[in-house]
Swiss-Prot record:
Keyword set includes tRNA-binding: yes
Family according to the record: Belongs to the universal ribosomal protein uS12 family.
Function: With S4 and S5 plays an important role in translational accuracy. Interacts with and stabilizes bases of the 16S rRNA that are involved in tRNA selection in the A site and with the mRNA backbone. Located at the interface of the 30S and 50S subunits, it traverses the body of the 30S subunit contacting proteins on the other side and probably holding the rRNA structure together. The combined cluster of proteins S8, S12 and S17 appears to hold together the shoulder and platform of the 30S subunit.
Organism of derivation: Pseudomonas syringae pv. tomato (strain ATCC BAA-871 / DC3000)
Quaternary structure and interacting proteins, as annotated: Part of the 30S ribosomal subunit. Contacts proteins S8 and S17. May interact with IF1 in the 30S initiation complex.
Encoding gene (name): rpsL
Gene Ontology terms, MF aspect: rRNA binding; structural constituent of ribosome; tRNA binding
Name this polypeptide is given: Small ribosomal subunit protein uS12
Pfam name, any one: Ribosom_S12_S23
Lineage top rank: taxon: Bacteria
HAMAP family, A to Z: Ribosomal_uS12_B (MF_00403_B)
Amino acid sequence: MATINQLVRQPRKRIVEKSDVPALQNCPQRRGVCTRVYTTTPKKPNSALRKVCRVRLTNGFEVSSYIGGEGHNLQEHSVVLIRGGRVKDLPGVRYHTVRGSLDTSGVKGRNQGRSKYGTKKPK
């Protein structure tokens, strides 16, 4: 236990919380340009081909971003919006692309959970 005198001379240090999404720089989303669109395999015990894109953000960061939903229209030089949110079985992927904004289309034929995939209400 520190004495009052010690605390007067040198106060207690605050614990600095480290951000999970440093590239967003305290913004809710960021815009960027796809530099590479590819598929990758998840960690054990899962098995799939997960759709991922490398994005160069407007603030200069280059990050990997997961493309959720079935099917997408992204290619190199597509402009995308990314949000935070990691993919647990893909190491190094800490961001999600926002479906239905900028160059990213919504998921076709989606009827439930549409707001998460940028799909309009069917008529």
